[in-house]
Amino acid sequence: MAFSEGRIHRGRPTPYPWERQALELVYRHESLSDTDPHQAWELHELYAPASGRLYEIDLLFLSRQGLFLVEIKSHPGILTGDIVDWTFSDEGRRRTLECPYPGANLKAKVLADLLERQLGSDRPYVHAAVFLSNVTDVRLDGGRPPWLLLPKDVGSKLVNGFDGRDARRIVNRSMMKQLLQAAHRLGLRPSATARMVGGYQLGELVDDGEGYQEHLAKNAAVERDQARVRSYLVPAATSAERRAQLHRAARREARTLAEIGQHPGILAYRAFVDD
């Protein structure tokens, strides 16, 4: 039974064909069925008003086993590495990146906390996962972790759980309806167009610190020009006085970095952008 369009809550249209292909691999998997409580939210963002934090989410999938927050990676080739760094090797080309699971797990914890506030203890458990949509082999130290999804079993793991055993809190139709009603209230919304800051397009979240978030970013005009963008957070209920105070603190840090200039171990300051 095909997974119907009515169960997919779509976000922004993706400009990346590999992202669209990865999502379709999930929806077309033979393990998925057009039955409750199955629901999917693709390309959404999660806004936490109390902190001002914003998290990009590739895919959320609801099944009887809970809510799965899935980070999608579509690099081709053979995956090697450990719990810290991953390397994809394909026809002589190598690409190394930080293991994306900790970032996905952080988002899952934020979502779980927001769900707890909206639904109390009667909420689905939130699992973090990483889906490698284009990998040919996995050779990680210690073997394949249970949260790592591959094209051959992505559907079965989302439907049946990572280990195939029933979760302690099974999601029924009533819980599904509560979640659908609460989705907008808890800050889950379709992603806007690509976020731009000072001519740079924000990418992966790499640091989630006290009062700020940092993203990798690419120059929209010169793709090889890459940077890290630090965004200082302003909670939704912040007064004008407190907002001005936070703005001054951000400017002070920018001035300090500008005065340091080039220094080993410290990224060089480029610009301060008001948002």
Please state what every model-predicted region is:
Residues 260-264:
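Conserved N-lobe motifs of Hanks-type protein kinase catalytic domains
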Residues 1-205:
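Intrinsically disordered, low-complexity Ser/Thr/Pro/Gly-rich regulatory segments
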Residues 54-55, 210-211, 275:
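Short, flexible loop/turn motifs enriched in small residues
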